[in-house]
Amino acid sequence: MAAKPGIPKGTRDFSPVEMAKRNYIFNTIRDVYHLYGFQQIETPSMEMLSTLMGKYGEEGDKLLFKIQNSGDYFSGITDEELLSRNAAKLASKFCEKGLRYDLTVPFARYVVMHRDEITFPFKRYQIQPVWRADRPQKGRYREFYQCDADVVGSDSLLNEVELMQIVDTVFTRFGIRVCIKINNRKILTGIAEIIGEADKIVDITVAIDKLDKIGLDNVNKELAEKGISEEAIAKLQPIILLSGTNTEKLATLKTVLSDSETGLKGVEESEFILNTLQTMGLKNEIELDLTLARGLNYYTGAIFEVKALDVQIGSITGGGRYDNLTGVFGMAGVSGVGISFGADRIFDVLNQLELYPKEAVNGTQLLFINFGEKEAAFSMGILSKARAAGIRAEIFPDAAKMKKQMSYANVKNIPFVAIVGENEMNEGKAMLKNMESGEQQLVTAEELIGALTK
Amino acid sequence: MAAKPGIPKGTRDFSPVEMAKRNYIFNTIRDVYHLYGFQQIETPSMEMLSTLMGKYGEEGDKLLFKIQNSGDYFSGITDEELLSRNAAKLASKFCEKGLRYDLTVPFARYVVMHRDEITFPFKRYQIQPVWRADRPQKGRYREFYQCDADVVGSDSLLNEVELMQIVDTVFTRFGIRVCIKINNRKILTGIAEIIGEADKIVDITVAIDKLDKIGLDNVNKELAEKGISEEAIAKLQPIILLSGTNTEKLATLKTVLSDSETGLKGVEESEFILNTLQTMGLKNEIELDLTLARGLNYYTGAIFEVKALDVQIGSITGGGRYDNLTGVFGMAGVSGVGISFGADRIFDVLNQLELYPKEAVNGTQLLFINFGEKEAAFSMGILSKARAAGIRAEIFPDAAKMKKQMSYANVKNIPFVAIVGENEMNEGKAMLKNMESGEQQLVTAEELIGALTK
C-alpha cells in the first residue's frame, strides 16, 4: 500500500495559475531592473556553513537548513561526542553545507570571490529562493523567493535615487498604490547623540510610531518608562511631533540636530534624495518617516520601506545603504545600497485587489477539438501554421467526448476553440468558436490566424 | 582574519553574461512549451525523504542530499544505535527531508496530491534545479537545472508527435543542427521475445551499436560471448544490419517481428509517429535507431534522444512514454510521455558554435557619463525619458575619471554612450557616441530615443 504523499511543512507547490501570476511579478520586476542597467547573477542553493554561520545572529544560525555530509559523516567523531547528543555542536560535524538564508550573504561572498572579474560599480540583481527553518504560519514559508537589486562599489546617492525610481516604476506597473517611506540611519544616530541615549533608539522609534494611536502624553509616558530622562524627552518633542511636508520636516530636523555632525549629514543626504526625486517626478508618494528603523545594525545611510495603501499588510519592499557588506569575508571598503521586493506579499496584494492583467494569466489561445484520426491529421496542419504565427495552440490529444473537450477548454480558460468535422474538412476550413461570445464562423487557416493575432 | 570564501564542490556561481545566456536558453524552451499549450508548475526544493527514497535505485538513494531535522534530531535514537555509526540507517532518523533529485518524482507526487484540481490531459512543464551528490567532474554538477515537459492522462500518440515538433522547433530556434533518434520499448521487447532472450536486450543493443566501429563478425562474436545462442544470433542478423530509410527499416521489422504482438505494436506506433511527422515537415532529421535503449525499466513505449550534429557531446535531450508514473504513490493507470532538455549541455553547444544571438547577451543600451552634480541632474532628465521609451539605460553614479567610465561601458558591452558637459547642457542636448563606429552626434532627448529605438 503506497503512502499518501505530502510535502514538508512550510513549503508549497505552485499550480499553473499561481505560476503565471508569479512569473508576471518576477518579469515585471526583472524588466524594470534591466531598464536601470542591473544584471542578473545566480549563486548555488547550498553554501558552505562557514560562509553562512554567524551572519544572521544566534537565532539565524538555528534557522539554517543544514545538509548532511555524504558518505560516512561519523568519521572523526568520538563516541563521547556522539553520546553527548549536543545537536548544535554535532550538526557542525555532520554537516558542512547549508541552504542559503538570504541573497545578501551569498552576494557578499560572490563579490569577494569574483572581485577580479567584476567592474565596479557592480549593479546586480538576483531572484532566487531562500530557506529558513522558521515556524511556518500564514504568509510565512520555509522556502520563498527574494528579488534583490544592489549597487556595490559606489557611494553616490544617485543610486538611492534610482532605486526609489525603480520602486515607483514597479508598483506603477503593478497598479498598486504605495507610499514609499524613507529615513536615514545617520538621522537616527544624530537623535541618539543629541539626547545622549544612543542605545535607546529602537525604543524611541517604537514609541514615536504610536503617536497617532495613543497621543503625545502616552508616548512621553512610554519613553519615561523605558528609562529615558526627562531632559531627553523634552529634546525629543519636536521630533515626536514632526509633521508637514518632507521639506518642512527636514527644516525642523536641521535645527534640532544642529549639534550632531552625523545627524546633519543624514539630513543632507535625505534632502538630496528627496529633492532629486521631486525633480524627476514620482508617481507614488514618498515620505520622510523617522519611525522607520529597519535593521539598524546593518544599515548605515538611507533606509526605505514600501507600504501598500489599499491593503492591510506589512512592508512589501525594503532596503537601504550599508557600508561594509564584504568586510566579514576580508574585503573592506565596499559600500553598497540595495532593495528587496517581497514577492509573496506582492502576490497577496495583487490577488486581493484583483490587479493581474488578463493576458498575464492566460495561456493557450486556441484549442482544436479532436473528432478522430482523419480530422486530427487535418487539424494538425492548421495548428502548425497557427503556431508558426506565434499563436499558443493545442489539439485535444484523444478523440474524447465533445463535452469533455469543451470542459477542458473552459477549465484552461482557452478563449477560442476550432471545430473540424467532416463538413469543415471537405471545405478545407475550420469552425472557429469564440468561447466568450459563443459566436462561430467558418474560416480558412489564414483567416483563423488573422482572427487570433489582430 | 576572515577566511577566504568558497562554494561547495560541484556547484557554480553564474555571472551576468552566463545568466544572460542561460536565460536565453530557458526562455526559448519556455516560449515553445507555451506555443504547444504546456503550463508551468513549480514544486518545493525539498521533498519528504519518504517521497524520494527507493525511486532511483540503491545508488540514487545514496546520491540524495539529506537535510538535517531542526531542533533535537537525536531524540528517539538509542545510545546503541548511535554507537553503531550506521551512516545510512541513522540518516533516515536524523533527516526526514531531502533535496529533489529530478523533476519526475516530484511531478508524480504533485499529480497524486492535486488529482482533484487537475483537468486531464495535464500538459505541464517545469524548469527548476535538481541536486545529486555525484562525484563532480567536467560537465557534471551537483546542482543543475532540468527543463521537463510531460503530458499525463492521455495515451494518444499525437503527444509523441507534438513533443518531437517541440524538439525540432527549439533546436531550429537555437540554430543547432540535430538528429532526433527515436525507438520504441515495445520493439525492443519484441526482439527479445523472438530470440527468447528477454534479459539480454541491453547487451544486444550495446553490441549492435558497435557495428560501424568493429564490423559484423565482431558484433556477432560479442553477442556469443554474452551468452546469446547461435540460433538467436542468426535471427538477429536482419536487425543488426538494419539500414535504409525509416520506412525501409519499419518494413524489415514488420517481417522479423511478425510473431511478436508487442513488437508489431511498437512498429505500428513508430510508423504513426514518423508518418505524421513527415506530413508536418520537420526541419531536422528524425531517425529510427534500434540501439537507443534509455531507461528500459521506466519507459514503456516510444523513446527518444537528440544528438547535436556539429559538436561531440552526449545526448542533449531525451524522453519517452511511461505507463505508470504515479502508481508508486497509489494512483494507477496514469500514462504519460515527456521530454527533458539538457540545459547545461545545450549551453556548452551554443558556446562552442558561438550561436548566441547578440541581443540575447546584451544588457544596457546606453550609458550617461557623469561629469558632476549639475551635469548628472540634467542627464537624469533625459535618462528618465529614455527609460520611459523602453531603453535600458544607466548613468555612471560617480563623477569618476572619464577613462574609468568609458572602460565601464566597454566591459559591460554598452553600445551607446551619452556625454553631457557644459556645452551640451547649454544647448539642452547630449553628445551621443556609437561605441562601435566611434561616430558622435549632438542630439535632443527625442533624437536620442529615436536613434536607439529604430
Swiss-Prot record, chains A, B:
Natural source organism: Bacteroides fragilis (strain YCH46)
Reaction equation(s) it catalyzes: tRNA(His) + L-histidine + ATP = L-histidyl-tRNA(His) + AMP + diphosphate + H(+)
HAMAP family: His_tRNA_synth (MF_00127)
Subunit comment: Homodimer.
Keyword annotations of the record: Aminoacyl-tRNA synthetase, ATP-binding, Cytoplasm, Ligase, Nucleotide-binding, Protein biosynthesis
Pfam family, one: HGTP_anticodon
Signal sequence, renumbered to the chain: none
Primary residence: cytoplasm
Protein name: Histidine--tRNA ligase
Top-level taxon: Bacteria
